[in-house]
Amino acid sequence: MRTAKLLAILLPFTCAGQTFLSAVSAAPPQVVRESPDRAQNGLALSAGSGDPRTTSTDWPGFLGPHRNGKSDEHGLPNAWPPKGLPVVWQQAVGTGYSAPAISNGQLFHFSRTKDSAQLKCLNAETGAEQWTCEYPSNFVDMLGYNNGPRATPVVDGPNVYTFGAEGVLQCVRIADGHPAWRLDTTKQFNVVTKFLGVGSTPLVWHDLLLVNVGGSPPGGPPDVYWANGAVDSNGSAIVAFDKATGAVRWQTGNDLASYSSPVVAKINGRDTVFMLARNNLLAIDPEKGQTIAQFPWRARKLESVNASTPVVAGDEIFVSETYEVGSAVVRFDSAKFTEVWTDRNRRRNQAMALHWNTPIELDGYLYGSSGYHAPEAELRCVEWKTGKLMWSEPGMTRSSLLLVDGKLVCLSEDGTLRILKPSPQKYEELAKWEYGVGEGEETRCSAALCAQAFHQQLVLVIQHRR
């Protein structure tokens, strides 16, 4: 099979029955293959155009190589074949909301099968399984969503890291699929059970693995409902583990865990880690392991969560949530945060209210899916410097975005994949594809965790079989 560009997209499902992770081509096909393994839940793949302008780029974890949803690859077409995008291969996976990670021709997918959390390593071109690393998991979602992992695998050199819904953090050797180390952060840091388990993807920074842990002092409440949200912190909002051994190097932040993932940016010549925790946006010095500043940002509702990952542009940071306070842009001067604009206490409608998705920043504008429930969700464009709403497009259900070759790749919960031309003037759709299924099948994802990955123009789609 000729190497071709791969657009990898994962749609998580919650309905009962079988699920298949499918990989399909984002460009006209050359070769179509199918894996013989079509077990209970699955993954499928198709070949792309093999555009000679394309340079293959790994997608080693959540939001891609730069952790901002932007790909370095080129050659994404403006239109797709009238009959849609063909399937290349299909592979069984378990339940969960984890996106795929892709590196050196290997695809890593983390899911739950019965009482086992499973990290699978697949050949990205053929879907053939190379190994599976698993451990027991008894996590049960408090709100009735599925019990699989939420965080995306992180590939770093010879290792891949996972963070399970129950709080198990592990380092797995890519060469043989065996764990180099494994630990339970829930037990080690006394993490009080929260609504949806662990949902933050760790960040590799030099020789450290930075993790959104959010533990509490011993003897605390059994869960957030029992305590009516009054849960103390033990100073482990973010914990730095030695990525080679799992030893704790430092911990900082008097806050609890969120479903947002940390990012790192260079501000005034120094690396700063930004993490939207349960109650605050934190600025952290990763060299000293100290919290520099915090900016309060959380809705008053007990069940509210901070889940969108901060977006950094220059010395400014965008944060958002969907339950009450909406969005804000703050400026960080290496010592403190200063508001640029905020939705909080605005009389007009909020600029953006992001639930699970992280927006794309491009040329001074933000593009993201605003809305709590699928029926009310709409795609929006907002001016970065003012929060001014430029346009909104309803009726798309909740969606996630990537920026590829100057175009937006938009994946919606209902399984619709679109290519959009980014413009602050108006919504402009270049291509649209609804993933086709056979009789007795449906394609949809839930909780707006329609995570995507881009590598060599193959599309990964989850297909549910009733």
Describe each region flagged by the PLM.
Residues 1-3:
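N-terminal secretory signal peptides that target proteins for export/translocation
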Residues 5-19:
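Bacterial N-terminal signal peptides
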Residues 18-466:
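Noncatalytic, solvent-exposed loop/strand surfaces
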